């Protein structure tokens, strides 16, 4: 079969970084083609070039044998290329229907007929299999529902090439299954799907072929994904063998460092109690809506709590806001690192130093020399991959952004408790190992760590103990010797006769 999409010697550089170097591969018509690589490997840059968002320095893109000369996203759109990014491109203030038909509103005599628009979109969504109210404002939807709207938009536009960048990172299992069904239907129509993901299960389930990038270069191209293995792909991604991505090892545990009794709040109505010892990593697992992130926000003081007591090293603390929590020795790395974690538009240096300024000066002012020294120390310690501490943090990969957030809190004095929500979401397998190593080092130093994750293998891989949540309650408290994937998942599933302990 002839190639439908072809990348030929694509190169793209930025100051101090060669993001892509002579990348070439082809994709057949109607194929789902996987694109993998560590964060910073060049995947996002290649997608930006394909979408017309950025121009390549050299090389060509061909679609159905025709060389593409587009220089903008609009040009790429007219060529039949649609990219669905992790950062969604919807207008929150508009309805679902208005977003799906933006720029193409059905009108008569210059007047938009809202009823016609909503009914048209409702019919299209039903046809696709997406159950979302077309009259709902996008701002009222969950992140997962917004992702489904983006995907529906691409389907309705009859694109020839659709690139999906980590499409299931915010989807529930049910939403993911709907997406997979849509991909199968698009494939049958002859649409080319470029599927960017770190999830090997999805890659093997969906993809016909696969390209692996490493350090901006083509590390491997597999025309038939069935002829490769997970271990081979991981080795190609990282350039080395990773036999145990989790790297868990037993550590001596001290006394109780964090104790929580009867914690509840507006979105967590059932009181929760637990404790974490010095050097312990306590994992929280649950399905979407189980209350994990709500618990973290209450603990940190980001949301007001109804009741409950929190003690750190036996001293009662009242984290009614994040500042109070930090003063008590507790910090949070939030679930959505782009919007709640990093300070966009600021440098790596500024993001690391922002929480430490009060320790250097009563006026919260750091000299350029102090700020640079602090940033350099944590860039080296946490192995942040960047050409310069002055680089805008938004240009870093997800794994390196997470390291910078950790560096910010490690530079804060007197931190005893770290709460980290979805520590490796959207992060490649090599960077995951590095994040886990950082957590192990912190635990070995006596820090109490609470890890919240929707990925059960991750929670089981790195935790000393697991609290399973279901419908706002603790459904199980499992010690490491008793870890069993089936039992933990069963405890996490909603049940009228809920809960107990394993």
UniProtKB/Swiss-Prot annotation:
GO terms for molecular function: ABC-type L-arabinose transporter activity; ATP binding; ATP hydrolysis activity. This is Arabinose import ATP-binding protein AraG. PROSITE patterns: ABC_TRANSPORTER_1, ABC_TRANSPORTER_2, ARAG. The gene is araG. ATP binds at residues 37-44. Keywords: ATP-binding, Cell inner membrane, Cell membrane, Membrane, Nucleotide-binding, Repeat, Sugar transport, Translocase, Transport. The keyword Acetylation does not apply. Its main location: membrane. It comes from the Bacteria. InterPro entries: AAA+_ATPase, ABC_carbohydrate_import_ATPase, ABC_transporter-like_ATP-bd, ABC_transporter-like_CS, P-loop_NTPase. GO terms for cellular component: plasma membrane. The lineage of its organism: Bacteria, Pseudomonadati, Pseudomonadota, Alphaproteobacteria, Hyphomicrobiales. The keyword Ribosomal protein does not apply. The complex is composed of two ATP-binding proteins (AraG), two transmembrane proteins (AraH) and a solute-binding protein (AraF). It is an enzyme of class 7 (translocase). Its EC number is 7.5.2.12. It is found in: Cell inner membrane. It is a peripheral membrane protein. It catalyses: L-arabinose(out) + ATP + H2O = L-arabinose(in) + ADP + phosphate + H(+). Pfam families: ABC_tran. Belongs to the ABC transporter superfamily. Arabinose importer (TC 3.A.1.2.2) family. Residues 5-240, 253-496 form the ABC transporter domain. Part of the ABC transporter complex AraFGH involved in arabinose import. Responsible for energy coupling to the transport system.
């Amino acid at each position: 079969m002839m190639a439908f999409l072809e990348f030929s010697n694509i190169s793209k550089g930025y100051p101090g970084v060669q993001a892509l170097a002579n990348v070439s591969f082809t994709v057949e018509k109607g194929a789902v083609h996987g694109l993998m690589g560590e964060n910073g490997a060049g995947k996002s840059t290649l997608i930006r070039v394909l979408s017309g968002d950025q121009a390549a320095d050299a090389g060509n893109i061909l679609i159905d044998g025709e060389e593409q000369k587009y220089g903008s996203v609009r040009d790429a759109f007219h060529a039949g290329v649609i990219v669905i990014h992790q950062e969604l491109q919807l207008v929150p203030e508009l309805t679902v229907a208005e977003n799906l038909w933006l720029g193409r509103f059905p009108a008569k005599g210059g007047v938009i007929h809202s009823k016609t628009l909503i009914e048209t979109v409702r019919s299209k969504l039903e046809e696709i299999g997406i159950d979302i109210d077309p009259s709902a404002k996008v701002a009222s939807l969950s992140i997962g529902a917004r992702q489904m709207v983006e995907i529906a938009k691409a389907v309705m536009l009859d694109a020839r090439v659709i690139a999906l960048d980590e499409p299931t990172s915010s989807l529930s299992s049910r939403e993911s299954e709907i997406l997979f069904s849509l991909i199968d239907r698009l494939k049958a129509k002859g649409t080319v799907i470029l599927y960017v993901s770190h999830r090997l299960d999805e890659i093997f389930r969906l993809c016909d072929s696969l390209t692996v990038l490493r350090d901006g270069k083509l590390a491997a191209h597999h025309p038939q994904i069935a002829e490769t293995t997970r271990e081979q792909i991981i080795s190609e991604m990282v350039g080395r063998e990773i036999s145990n991505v989790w790297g868990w090892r037993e550590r001596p545990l001290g006394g109780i460092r964090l104790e929580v009794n009867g914690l509840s709040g507006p979105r967590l109505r059932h009181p929760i109690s637990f404790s974490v010892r010095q050097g312990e990593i306590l994992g929280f697992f649950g399905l979407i809506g189980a209350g994990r992130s709500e618990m973290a926000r209450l603990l940190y003081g980001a949301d007001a709590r109804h009741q409950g007591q929190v003690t750190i090293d036996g001293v009662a603390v009242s984290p009614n806001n994040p500042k109070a929590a930090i003063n008590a020795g507790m910090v949070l790395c939030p679930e959505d690192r782009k919007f709640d974690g990093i300070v966009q538009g600021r440098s790596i240096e500024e993001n690391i130093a922002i929480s430490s300024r009060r320790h250097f000066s009563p006026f919260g002012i750091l000299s350029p020399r102090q700020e640079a020294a602090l940033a350099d120390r944590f860039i080296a310690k946490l192995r942040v991959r960047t050409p310069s501490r002055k680089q805008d943090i938004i240009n870093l990969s997800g794994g390196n952004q997470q390291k910078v957030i950790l560096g910010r809190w490690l530079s804060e004095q007197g931190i005893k408790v770290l709460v980290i929500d979805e520590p490796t979401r959207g992060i490649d397998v090599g960077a995951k190992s590095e994040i886990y190593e950082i957590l192990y080092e912190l635990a070995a130093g006596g820090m109490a760590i609470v890890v919240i994750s929707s990925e059960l293998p991750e929670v089981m891989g790195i935790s000393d103990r697991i609290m399973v949540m279901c419908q706002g309650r603790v459904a199980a408290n499992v010690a490491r010797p008793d870890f069993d994937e089936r039992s933990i998942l069963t405890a996490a599933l909603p049940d009228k006769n809920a809960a107990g302990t394993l």
